[in-house]
Amino acid sequence: MNKDLDYIFPDPPEGVDPRALDPERIPESVAIIMDGNGRWAKKRALNRLKGHKAGIEAVREAIRCASDLGVRYLTIYSFSTENWSRPQDEVDALMKLLRNYMKTCLKTAEKNRMCVRVLGDKTRLDEDIRTRIAELEEATKNNDGLHFQIAINYGGRDEIVRAVKKPSAKVQSGEVDPAGITADTL
């Protein structure tokens, strides 16, 4: 590791040189759940939107650190299916932040050869956001740098429901014999 990593480790423990990190011990994949932006803002007497904006800055820093450290995959869990139950003005503000982030994310991806994928159920997102996602994924699909995955409108329960519906529909249409459904076919 020969990059200047002082910004990641501004005050390393005594005897630790960040430039001597063993690349073999750097994880290939890192996942971050974006939780607590509202609490962060409240603790600082700021409105929740300021917390969400700070969260976006944290994502930018995570991308930079992951790239510099040689992490291959970075997944950010940013907006769960449960987040739709927040007050409508907060959901609207989050969608506006997402729209703006998609623009800057493309610039970052182009600059750093980053491949971007958006995970989750995109059907509930507005058409313009789905279009931006499709453009971003298409523009970056052949990039060979950090693989950045953004989970939007995701949820464990929702994933299970969608996983069950797919083979159920095939059984109902006669395409698949129920006896043929195994863990591998799911």
Describe these PLM feature segments.
Residues 1-186:
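Flexible, compositionally biased loop and terminal segments
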